[in-house]
Structure formats: structure tokens, C-alpha cells
């Protein structure tokens, strides 16, 4: 460590904590997408003698970054505890939450290269892989996870429990799910500190959040030449119908109307079941600083909308998952968190349906693990989380197949359709769609 760091100033220790987290986050994103990669902890030499490196085992990389994250936590303040440490800076809450996320991936399933890194007693193969389509070994590539996966799940549970149970924890669920997205689009901080960390962008300088995905708006409608809400990222009717119709999150995850000129300028309902827009980003929620630039822009203008890396419900759901998978049950209360796995899940669902709603307890229709799998889909739609979750659970192939079958049955119209925890009959899907406009005849 440098002389400045060793001097013991709290500022230098905070900077060290931020640096450790950012490096760990970078390697984490590489490893969970690419597996075994080149890895080094020191600086590159001026003669480039340590630049060209071979791959090393992902388990070794995970072990290193977990250790770094554990160190970083000790140096970091809670959000708001020190001036300028807001959701755009690395803070204690995010570092602990990120360590939990890293630990779950470190202990999760992934495709492994058995030729370069042969399986041994430290690696556990996917059970009954040859009888599980999509999970069988192919050309020495196999699905595996570390044999000590429970150690990582213990880390995840502990870190989440410490956040939940700490009286100094400043993070809470925003009571209004829509407020999360209206605030971030408007370049405002979340009042409840729900967002543990946001990648900071600047209007006119960086960030295509909203222009590449979000509620669709055509160009040349009085707000500038360019439109908003592209289809670079979109979803489909299968995901829409997975929601309970009373779930407050549904119309933020899936948004059918397009704002365009159809006689007059208004929203028009589209019915492409394979291309449903994400509703979490809207031009009409953006900051005036962005709109004023967009009004005269001839090319795509960076919105400045921050990308939310982690929200507080992730802490609750990771806690619930890790505790349950460690065999501690869904109803036993954690001494550290002060709540059970089931209660953590219910807190997330209470916001979606309202406290006291009978729908909050509908998760009991399925196994608790399946309830967690479903809840994470509904809570984090369009946030870049689902695919990677399914990989670490070993469920990516089977969930894709379930979706394909369901959508074929939806189009066929002669079979019951299973979508998540719901069974639909063909006649439940409408042939005609009725909707109404607001008092101005502009928005549905």
C-alpha cells in the first residue's frame, strides 16, 4: 500500500475501498460472462512483460475478488454518511450487496472447460446432466459449480442479513414502484435510497438509457426529430402474462402503447406479442435539461439517465434465496437480519400488491425456491439480471424451452398454457382489446 494509505487517513481508505470494489466489479462482470479469463492484481509493467497472460480458473478469481470485497467493506461509509457519498459513489451498502451477488455467482452453476481445467474433487457436476436436455456434457464442456458452494451462500446470506438488520442501514424500499423510474429518468436521487449504486451518466455526454429501450415515442411530434424508447431491448407477451394483473410492476416491465401521430398525436396500442416495450423509461419523465437538447438535436442525444446496478429488493431476495438454499427453511428468523426468508420475500410482494392484499401470499402456490425464481423475474424486468440469474441456477435452457412451448400454445389456441405459476385457457387471451384514453385523449 502507498504511504498515503498507510498514513491512516479515512479519505484514503475510502478511496481504496472504492478502487477494490470497482476492480472486483469489473472482473466479476468478465468472469460471469466469459468464465476462465486472464487475471492479475498488480499494475502492468512498462515493458509489458506481464501483459500477455493465459487464462486462470474462475474459482481462483472469485476467491480473490471475494477477499478484496471483504476488505473494501471495512473502508466504506454508508450512503449519506460522508459528504458526496450518494448512490453514484461506492458505499458500504452496495459493497456488501455486491459481495452477496458475487458470492451467489461464485457458488452457482456455469459452463466449464473440462479440457483446459479438468474437473476434480473441488468441482461438483450438474446432477443427472445426461438426462437433462441442454445440461449434458459436450466436447469436454460441462455444467459445474465449486464443491464448497455452501461457503459462498453463507457469505451471501450474512452480508444481506447485516444490511437488513443494521439500524444504521439507510436503504429502504420506495413505497411507490413507479417512483424509482420516474426519479431516475428525471435525474433525481431516490428519496428512500432504494438504489444502492447507479452508474452515473451526464445529459448530452453519456448514457443511452431510455433512447435504446423504454416507452416508445416516434420522432417529429413536437419534442424533437429523434424518438425515444427503441427496441434494442424489449420483451414479449409471455413475460406480460406471467404477471398477476394487479401487480404494480407489470406495466413498468411491459408497455404496449406507442406514442405517435395517428390522425392526432397520441398513444396507439400495438399488438406485436414478440416485441413489447419496457415501461421503466419514458421521455415524459426525463429532465428538462435533456428535453431542451433533444428539441433541436439531429442525432441521438445521451439522456444522462443513470443505470441502476443494484436496488434494495435485491438484498431482500438474495437473503431469502441464500438462507433457504442453505437448508435454514423459509420461516426461521435470522438472528442477524431479524426476519425470515419468507418475510423478506413478502416485503417485496407487499409493495407490488399493497400491504394486506391476499395476493402477497400467492407465492405459496409453488416451492419456495421457485417463488424466488419467479419474484426476481417480476421485480427486475429489463434490468439486465434475468439471464445471468438463470445461468447460475442452471435453469437457462429449461426456462427458454418453457417460454417457447407456451408461446406456441398461445398462437395455436387449443391447449392450456402454463406461464410461471399460472395456467391459462386459450379463451383467456383476447381476440379484441378494449382501452380508453385520458381526458385529453392523448394517453391510454
Predicted segments, located by residue:
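Flexible, polar/acidic helix-loop-strand segments at domain edges
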Residues: 241-312
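Alpha-helical solenoid repeat scaffolds, predominantly canonical TPR units
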Residues: 61, 68, 115, 152, ...
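Conserved, well-structured interaction surfaces
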Residues: 1-34, 49-85, 281-307, 315-318, ...
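Polar, glycine-rich mid-to-C-terminal structural blocks
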Residues: 105-107, 143-243
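Short coil/turn linking the two alpha-helices of tandem helical-hairpin repeats
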Residues: 31-38, 80, 102-114, 325-330
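Short coil/linker segments at helix-helix boundaries
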Residues: 36-58, 109-155
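Long, intrinsically disordered, low-complexity segments
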Residues: 64-66, 87, 123-140, 144-148, ...
Amino acid at each position: 500500500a502507498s504511504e498515503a494509505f498507510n498514513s491512516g487517513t479515512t479519505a484514503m481508505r475510502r478511496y481504496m475501498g472504492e478502487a477494490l470494489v470497482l476492480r472486483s466489479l469489473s472482473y466479476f462482470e468478465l468472469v460471469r460472462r466469459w468464465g476462465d479469463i486472464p487475471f492479475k492484481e498488480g499494475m502492468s509493467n512498462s515493458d509489458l512483460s506481464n501483459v500477455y497472460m493465459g487464462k486462470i480458473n474462475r474459482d481462483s478469481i472469485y476467491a480473490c475478488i471475494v477477499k478484496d470485497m471483504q476488505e473494501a467493506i471495512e473502508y466504506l461509509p454508508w450512503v449519506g454518511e460522508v459528504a458526496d457519498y450518494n448512490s453514484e459513489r461506492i458505499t458500504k451498502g452496495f459493497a456488501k450487496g455486491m459481495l452477496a451477488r458475487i458470492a451467489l455467482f461464485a457458488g452457482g452453476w456455469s459452463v466449464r472447460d473440462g479440457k483446459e481445467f479438468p474437473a476434480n474433487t473441488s468441482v461438483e457436476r450438474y446432477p443427472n446432466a445426461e438426462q437433462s436436455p441442454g445440461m449434458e456434457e459436450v466436447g469436454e464442456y460441462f455444467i459445474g459449480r465449486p464443491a464448497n458452494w455452501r461457503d459462498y451462500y453463507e457469505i451471501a446470506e450474512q452480508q444481506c442479513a447485516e444490511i437488513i438488520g443494521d439500524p444504521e442501514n439507510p436503504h429502504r424500499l420506495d413505497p411507490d414502484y413507479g417512483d424509482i423510474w420516474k426519479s431516475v429518468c428525471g435525474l433525481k436521487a431516490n428519496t428512500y435510497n432504494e438504489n444502492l449504486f447507479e452508474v452515473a451518466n451526464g445529459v448530452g455526454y453519456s448514457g443511452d438509457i431510455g433512447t435504446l429501450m423504454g416507452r416508445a415515442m416516434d420522432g417529429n411530434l413536437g419534442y424533437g426529430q429523434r424518438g425515444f424508447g427503441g427496441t434494442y431491448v424489449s420483451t414479449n407477451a409471455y413475460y406480460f402474462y406471467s404477471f398477476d394483473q394487479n401487480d404494480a410492476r407489470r406495466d413498468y416491465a411491459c408497455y404496449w402503447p406507442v406514442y405517435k401521430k395517428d390522425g392526432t398525436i397520441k398513444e396507439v396500442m400495438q399488438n406485436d406479442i414478440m416485441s413489447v416495450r419496457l415501461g421503466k423509461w419514458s421521455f415524459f419523465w426525463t429532465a428538462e435539461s435533456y428535453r431542451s437538447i433533444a428539441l433541436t438535436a439531429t442525432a441521438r442525444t445521451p439522456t444522462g439517465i443513470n443505470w441502476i446496478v443494484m436496488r434494495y429488493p435485491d438484498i431482500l431476495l438474495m437473503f431469502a434465496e441464500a438462507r433457504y438454499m442453505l437448508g435454514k427453511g423459509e420461516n426461521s428468523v435470522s438472528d442477524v437480519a431479524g426476519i425470515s426468508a419468507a418475510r423478506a420475500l413478502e416485503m417485496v410482494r407487499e409493495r407490488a400488491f399493497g400491504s394486506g392484499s391476499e395476493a402477497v401470499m400467492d407465492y405459496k402456490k409453488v416451492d419456495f425456491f421457485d417463488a424466488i425464481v419467479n419474484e426476481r423475474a417480476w421485480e427486475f424486468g429489463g434490468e439486465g439480471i434475468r439471464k445471468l440469474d438463470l445461468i447460475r441456477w442452471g435453469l437457462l435452457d429449461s426456462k427458454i424451452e418453457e417460454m417457447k412451448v407456451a408461446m406456441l400454445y398461445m398462437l395455436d389456441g387449443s391447449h392450456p398454457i402454463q406461464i410461471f405459476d399460472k395456467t391459462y385457457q386459450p379463451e383467456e387471451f383476447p381476440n379484441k382489446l378494449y382501452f380508453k384514453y385520458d381526458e385529453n385523449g392523448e394517453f391510454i
